[in-house]
C-alpha cells in the first residue's frame, strides 16, 4: 500500500490579507508563516508571484526598495500565510527611514512566533552581499530554516549558474551553522518553483498527513 502526501495548501490560493509597518500591527501571532526577504531589486516580488502563479500578487517595481511594509498573504488552509518583507539595501529613501525599515524587519524576524521558515532571495549575479549575510546571521541566531533562492538564473548560462550555486553552497556551509540550503531560481523559466513549494510544504503540511493509494488534490482557487 503506497503512502502519498496530501497537499491541503494551494499556493495559487494566496490572497492579500493586510499590511503592517510594525510588529504590533501584524495579524494575531498564531498559525504558520513562511516569509520572503531579499535585497532591493533582487527579484523578491517576481519570485513570490512565480511561486504562487499569480503575476499580480506582489507588486513589482523598477524602483528598488518600494516594498516598505510587511505584507501578509493568506492561503486556503487556516492559519497559513506567506509574508513579503521589506526589501533591504539601497532604496532611494532617507537614511532614517532605512534604519526604521531595518529595525522593523529585525523585530519581526526575532519575535514573530509563527515565523517557521524564510526564503531569502539573492540575485545570482550578486549573491551574499553584506545585507544578505546580516539576514543569515539573524536566521542563525534563531535557528530558522532558510532557503536561498538565487534568482535571475536565466541571466547566466547553465554552466556559470551551476558554478555560482556550488560556490554559494560552499560558503553557506563554511560560515553558518543552521538549516540553510540554496537553489537556482528563475521567475521567467520557472526553474526552482517546485523546489520552493517542496521547502514550504515541510512547514505547512504536517508530516503525518498521508493518505493511502490515491493522492487527494484540490482545484486551484481563481
From Swiss-Prot:
Coiled coil (residue ranges): none
Keywords, ordered alphabetically: Cell cycle, Cell division, GTP-binding, Magnesium, Metal-binding, Nucleotide-binding, Septation
Transmembrane segment boundaries: none
Pfam families: MMR_HSR1
Annotated binding of GTP, by residue: 38-45, 65-69, 84-87, 151-154, 184-187
Cofactor: Mg(2+)
Binding residues annotated for Mg(2+), in chain numbering: 45, 67
Protein name, UniProt field: Probable GTP-binding protein EngB
Taxonomic lineage: Bacteria, Pseudomonadati, Pseudomonadota, Gammaproteobacteria, Oceanospirillales
Amino acid at each position: 500500500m503506497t503512502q502519498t502526501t496530501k497537499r491541503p495548501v494551494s499556493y495559487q490560493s494566496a490572497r492579500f490579507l493586510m499590511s503592517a509597518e510594525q510588529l504590533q500591527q501584524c495579524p494575531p501571532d498564531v498559525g504558520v508563516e513562511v516569509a520572503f526577504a531579499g535585497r532591493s531589486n533582487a527579484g523578491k516580488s517576481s519570485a513570490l508571484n512565480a511561486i504562487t502563479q499569480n503575476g499580480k500578487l506582489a507588486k513589482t517595481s523598477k524602483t528598488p526598495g518600494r516594498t516598505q511594509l510587511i505584507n501578509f498573504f493568506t492561503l486556503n488552509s487556516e492559519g497559513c500565510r506567506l509574508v513579503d518583507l521589506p526589501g533591504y539595501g539601497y532604496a532611494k529613501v532617507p537614511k532614517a527611514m532605512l534604519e526604521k525599515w531595518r529595525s522593523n524587519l529585525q523585530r519581526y524576524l526575532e519575535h514573530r512566533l509563527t515565523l517557521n521558515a524564510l526564503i531569502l532571495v539573492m540575485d545570482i549575479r550578486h549573491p551574499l552581499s553584506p545585507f544578505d549575510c546580516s539576514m543569515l546571521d539573524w536566521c542563525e541566531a534563531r535557528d530558522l530554516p532558510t532557503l536561498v533562492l538565487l534568482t535571475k538564473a536565466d541571466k547566466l548560462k547553465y554552466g556559470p549558474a551551476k558554478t555560482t550555486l556550488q560556490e554559494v553552497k560552499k560558503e553557506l556551509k563554511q560560515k553558518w551553522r543552521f538549516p540553510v540550503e540554496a537553489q537556482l531560481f528563475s521567475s521567467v523559466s520557472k526553474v526552482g518553483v517546485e523546489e520552493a513549494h517542496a521547502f514550504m510544504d515541510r512547514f505547512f503540511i504536517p508530516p503525518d498527513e498521508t493518505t493511502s493509494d490515491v493522492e487527494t488534490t484540490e482545484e486551484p482557487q481563481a
